[in-house]
């Protein structure tokens, strides 16, 4: 951890000194291999190098809540993707065109990646939509169960063992690259870019691809999938949930007022005015202890 902290802080120092990071220029956020911890380190470096900037917390988003972060940022991308999928299934005409089953829960889902995005997406799909997730892919292999994986149990296993392997939730396949070749109705690449390319695009057997990762399909493969009739929901729309919540965090840091504070004050002021009106009308006084 110390080595990672030193690397992060050194890199952040160089970017900040060159003017590449500030609340008004570039505002980084977590991605593959990083978390709120690294964002907190970057914020600390910015504060030490720019002590005069009162908006220093807005130099980066995805921070820990105690460091100026916002509730819900960690799971925002995954939850946003689930909302996108739900919205797609509300459009029955598009669902029919994609040759999918009308109800989301009746479709087989494969998710590549079980990190921050994939894990929260799987959790929402499983618990909110009763979805059938038949395969989860990670760096070391694939967990497959044609009857559907118990996502809640898998999350417990991963938190304890740090791997999707060594459990009784399904069959483990040791070739992680085969995840995009698993036959399914909905394929969700939620890890790295370029996972669907000229080497495997012809082996993709799905009806709908939801681009949870950034650029998981290369341009040439995108054309091939289009010609095959595969519906693709683009990453710029699908994974915007994280960016949206990052914006709210940024605004909160710039305004220096947490969300709900102004509304609370407004409601308090409105209540006091109502009490004054009642007192004036009835010629009575309200116990001050009741107003507190």
Regions found by a protein language model. Give the residues of each.
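Glycine/serine-rich phosphate-binding loop and adjoining beta1-alpha1 elements at the start
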Residues: 1-105
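Conserved active-site and cofactor/substrate-binding residues in soluble primary-metabolism enzymes
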Residues: 2-6, 33-37, 41, 72, ...
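Rossmann-like adenosine-cofactor binding region
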Residues: 141-232
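Glycine-rich phosphate/diphosphate-binding loop of Rossmann-like nucleotide-binding domains
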Residues: 68, 72-181
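Adenosine-phosphate binding glycine-rich loop
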Residues: 88, 207-292
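General beta-strand structural signal in soluble alpha/beta enzymes
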Residues: 25-28, 53-56, 135-138, 188-189, ...
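Fold-independent oxyanion-binding glycine-rich loops
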Residues: 30-31, 45, 63, 114, ...
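Structural signal for hydrophobic packing residues in well-ordered secondary-structure cores
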Residues: 4-23, 43-54, 85-93, 116, ...
